[in-house]
Amino acid sequence: MAGHSQFKNIMHRKGRQDAVRSKMFSKLAREITVAAKAGLPDPMMNARLRLAIQNAKAQSMPKDNIDRAIKKAAGADGENYDEVRYEGYGPGGTAIIVEALTDNRNRTASNVRSIFTKAGGALGETGSVSFSFDHVGEITYKLSVGDADKVMEAAIEAGADDVETDEEGHYITCAFEALGEVSKALESGLGEAETVKAVWRAQNNVPVDEEKAQSLMKLIDSLEDDDDVQNVYSNFEVSEEVLAKLSA
């Protein structure tokens, strides 16, 4: 779990969050539209839509934006988005998984390939690196819901697999297939979660030096800046000394 926490800290470094937030609402809206189009436009009858709305609210997305994204799914002229996963290698032999929602597979594939190549990486085939990750459910709560013991007890009762607590919150991990069931069970003891989502968690992390870490961060930043890219995951780790420099 340490790798998850470290990667999160690096990606949340100063100055980067403003750049990410500028595109966050459009990415969240796209997920809401896709979720609404895949099932009923009612979050009570559509688990994926309910989670998408929940995650959007956690990022302070205005209600008008959320409603507009749902209505867009019902429009006859609305775009059809495909869910695509790309897998590749970054500097130092690190593994990277990219999740995208796109209305043009050729455009997105070309953009992602170009980003990998310019950063000294290489785009691989589907399945080339995902075997070294676990696809799991992640449910997050703010620290205000209770201490680590309370959250651990609630997580065990709900059928979760693990809990990590740091200075920013509680992170509960469960099987991907049980995400909806576990998140619903947690609500009785902890209330509504801040975020509920599926993530790719590295089984083992690859140590890299400061130079390679900086190259990797530029690669990941470029991927996240692409309008079609929803999520990026990697398996690199750095020393505490390098982490302090990168997070500054």
Curated annotation (Swiss-Prot):
Record carries keyword Transcription: yes
UniProt subcellular location: Cytoplasm
GO-annotated biological processes: regulation of DNA-templated transcription
GO molecular function, one term: DNA binding
GO cellular component, one term: cytosol
Keywords assigned by UniProt, alphabetized: Cytoplasm, DNA-binding, Transcription, Transcription regulation
Disulfide cysteine pairs (residue numbers): none
Matches recorded under NCBIfam families: PRK00110.1, PRK12378.1, YebC/PmpR family DNA-binding transcriptional regulator
PANTHER family: TRANSCRIPTIONAL REGULATORY PROTEIN YEBC-RELATED, TRANSLATIONAL ACTIVATOR OF CYTOCHROME C OXIDASE 1
Protein family: Belongs to the TACO1 family.
Record protein name field: Probable transcriptional regulatory protein Rleg2_3214
